[in-house]
């Protein structure tokens, strides 16, 4: 998106730096190594502000990367066994988004106070119903696709 904008208006002094996994763009921003970043939704930004002890300005909101539920073992949710293991991202905001996605598929139910994934952050402790007794396994996001053979379901971030 940013490279497209740069092509439309070459007068912009915009240097786009693509980061590899494991690099925290907010740490780069906090240290002054970059002037801005473009990748996160507001709940994640707020979580990062707390973690880094910094306050960042929001110039504009961005799209939210989709999450998907994948499996090498099951073709549909009805074939999911009792005590199935579900890999989810271990970072606060994507973990919450994963739980909301599992709830949307009627695999779990969150405490009713969690109504909007854009404004509330749920954790596994907020699961109030888990009819199949799913085991929620929190894993580093980049490792989740590699875990597909070892888990029943994996919630994977689209980026």
Name what the model sees in each region.
Residues 41-42, 158-159:
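Short secondary-structure boundary segments
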Residues 1-13:
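Short, polar/charged alpha-helical segment
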């Amino acid at each position: 998106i940013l490279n497209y904008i740069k092509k439309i208006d070459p007068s912009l002094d915009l240097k786009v730096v693509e980061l590899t996994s494991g690099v925290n763009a907010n740490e780069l921003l906090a240290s002054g190594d970059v002037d801005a970043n473009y990748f996160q939704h507001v709940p994640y930004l707020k979580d990062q502000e707390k973690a880094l002890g910094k306050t960042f300005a929001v110039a504009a909101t961005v799209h939210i990367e989709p999450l998907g539920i994948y499996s090498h073992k099951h073709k549909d949710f009805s074939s999911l066994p009792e005590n199935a293991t579900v890999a989810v991202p271990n970072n606060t905001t994507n973990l919450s988004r994963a739980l909301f996605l599992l709830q949307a598929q009627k695999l779990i139910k969150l405490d009713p106070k969690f109504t909007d994934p854009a404004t509330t952050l749920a954790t596994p402790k907020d699961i109030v119903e888990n009819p199949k007794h799913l085991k929620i396994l929190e894993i580093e996001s980049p490792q989740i696709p590699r875990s597909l053979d070892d888990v029943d379901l994996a919630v994977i971030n689209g980026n």
